[in-house]
Amino acid sequence: MERAGARGQRCGRRSHGLPLALRLALLLAGSPSGRAGAPEEQEIAGSGTVAPAGGDRCRGYYDVMGQWDPPFNCSSGVYSFCCGTCGYRFCCHDGPRRLDQSRCSNYDTPAWVQTGRPPARARDTAAPRDPARERSHTAVYAVCGVAALLVLVGIGARLGLERAHSPRARRTVTRTLTELLKQPGPQEPLPPPLGPPLGNCVQVQMGDGVLRGSPHNSTDKKRLNNAPLGSATPGPPRGPRLQGGGSLTLQPDYAKFATLKAAALKATEVAPQDFYQRFPSTETGPRTLPARVPRPPEDLPALLDACPWAPPGYVPPAGPVSSVPYAAWTAGRPARPLPRSHLVAQVSPAPRRPNHAPRRQFSVEKLPEAFSAQQASFYSSAGRGPRHLSTNSKAEVTV
């Protein structure tokens, strides 16, 4: 019995010692330096290494500069964890570095950023007005308006003076004076014409007895048969005076002349060819030389024999002269005496100048006949007609 009682006491003591041990263990686990809290930390770390589906989400926050950073999702590949600090957050792939966003408190606007609005300035509507100040403002406005008006008036006056003294205004005054000077004075009767009336004559240019038709394309001023021509004799000018208006009465002769002149100008403008149809001119045909009979070369000695200026030392051939036109041409003419120079040349047949052949001299009357054979041969070889030589005469001369 005693032994049983002793065992019961021991068990009671042990039962009282167990709650004390449990209490001590709980106290050690609650301390920060104890090892009892290690299993809880391992559980939190184990649950933080697993990323949620679709990536972690960083909440919006205010950074250290007081700027609001909007929220963002960490869903780019392996960067699916929200890491960093409460004032600077970013996405990372390391699960143990995951940020516990529930411990941060910078989700609201910081107090130092809220400076507040300045108080609105209350306008005192019951304050009395200052009449002196209002009068000063009115005086300033009036002075400025008067000054602006004076400036505008000065500018307008200057523009008016410049326009009045401009060259355009001077031209207007000059034009007015010209119109006044154009007013005609008392008209004087026109002097009578000095020459005979040439109203029905047509002037045709002629030269050396050959009519020259006036070409239709000439630039000379065409005159009609009813237009009077100017007199060849000098006289006073017969120009009309300036006519200022149509109310003045014109002289009968001048009115008739003006009417005829206007009709002539109108006729030349309407039908310029009518004048040539009414007064046709004689057109000359192409000028040609008369046909000449070529002379044989054996007639040349007879021509030289009849020429009084034969070259020195020339002896006419002895024999009968052939019956040619030269015989009849020289039969009725008296023989001319030889000049003294030819007598001296016959005495001394040697030429006066060395290296120079004696010149052959011909008579003016025999000169065309001497070159007739050469001209005929030249024209026949060239195959063209006679050559026209231009001279200063009005009629062309053909050789």
Swiss-Prot record:
InterPro entries: Shisa (IPR026910), Shisa_N (IPR053891). Keywords: Glycoprotein, Membrane, Signal, Transmembrane, Transmembrane helix. It comes from Mus musculus. This is Protein shisa-8. The chain crosses the membrane at residues 137-157. Brain-specific. Highly expressed in cerebellum and olfactory bulb. May regulate trafficking and current kinetics of AMPA-type glutamate receptor (AMPAR) at synapses. Residues 389-399 have a biased composition (Polar residues). It is a single-pass type I membrane protein. Its main location: membrane. The keyword Zinc does not apply. Belongs to the shisa family. Residues 37-136 are extracellular. Residues 1-36 form the signal peptide. Interacts with AMPAR subunits GRIA1 and GRIA2. Residues 207-248, 378-399 are annotated as: Disordered.
